[in-house]
Amino acid sequence: MASVLLSDLSNSAYMKLALAHPGERPEVSTLYPCKSIEEFNGSVVDFLDAHDNPDLLGAAVSACGWEVEGGFSMPNHGYRMERKDLRELLNIQRLHIVNDCVSRAMAVERLFDSEVIKVCGGDGEDGLTKALIGSGRGLGVAGIVQDDLGNPTILPCEGGHADLATISPREASVFALLEARYGHVSRERVASINGLAEVYECLGRIDEGDTRRVNVAEVVALAHIGDARATEAISLCQGWLAAMASDTALMLGARSGVYLSGELLELIGELIDWKAFEARFTDKGRLTAYMQDIPVYLTRTADLELIGLTTLFR
């Protein structure tokens, strides 16, 4: 049986490659470098060589970016992938290139019970809209709308670039520093991997005049040993992420649930105060009861994007 090639470039440092039969999950994925289009092409060739160059029915790629005029621009990688070139490289006609958050949303209906954990909220209503929030290098959003036959349609969004709002003097002080640095302050500036490090740095400048730069691994490590600034940075970050999930649920009418995914949550999941998250998620004044009924889930699988890509070949 012919196979399909699956590739996920949602991480800027490497990509995942896997083979699967149509409609089936890949058994294993392998990490390969992809810092340039030449390195991407070489990695694909090496991967296929290592698997005896199987017959390919088609291929699917997920990446952070968007398609324009037959090419997929990937700002995190700094290069553009052309459809015609990839078709020629693989000797195929059937090729899908989708946004990584869209591929995650496509996976939601295929997840096993063990791959989803409910973190807060009520029971919701079956058969209505769902939403997926993907927080990693960026902040992505997608809607999942069922048709009359129960088949999902994915609504791609760019909600991570929506304006950031604040609800406390502390949040406002962080916002002011980010505004001075960037001008426009989007939600992605705070509710992402880089955003967590930025929030930590802002708190240091506000409280101690500390201007040193840090990476997110340092912040998480400090939080694990009880560092007050790191703990507060995660608290602020989770609050803004909860607000993002809440606003998305309202705007999409996601009564069937909100699904949280991404590298940020993999890093700080055990440090999140889910009670505080729920309080921020449901704090919508007259619509608090409406929000309290919406379930919020955390996805727990390493290859969410690849699972989503398999749905394109059912």
Residue ranges of model-derived segments:
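Glycine-rich phosphate-binding loop of actin/hexokinase-like ATP-binding domains
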Residues: 115-187, 277-282, 286, 291
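Active-site nucleophile and cofactor-binding loops and adjacent substrate-binding regions
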Residues: 33-36, 76-77, 96-103, 122-125, ...
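Short, acidic Gly/Pro/Ser/Thr-rich loop/turn segments
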Residues: 14, 66-68, 138-142, 198, ...
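ATP-binding/phosphotransfer module of carbohydrate and carboxylate kinases, centering on a glycine-rich
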Residues: 1-52, 173-314
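Short beta-strand-loop/turn "lid" adjacent to the catalytic site in phosphate-handling enzymes
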Residues: 51-97, 102, 106-115, 132, ...
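Short coil/turn segments at beta-strand junctions that form active-site/ligand-binding loops
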Residues: 1-2, 55-57, 93, 128-129, ...
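Short beta-strand segments
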Residues: 8, 60-64, 98, 131-138, ...
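ATP-dependent carbohydrate kinase catalytic cores
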Residues: 94-125, 217-231, 235
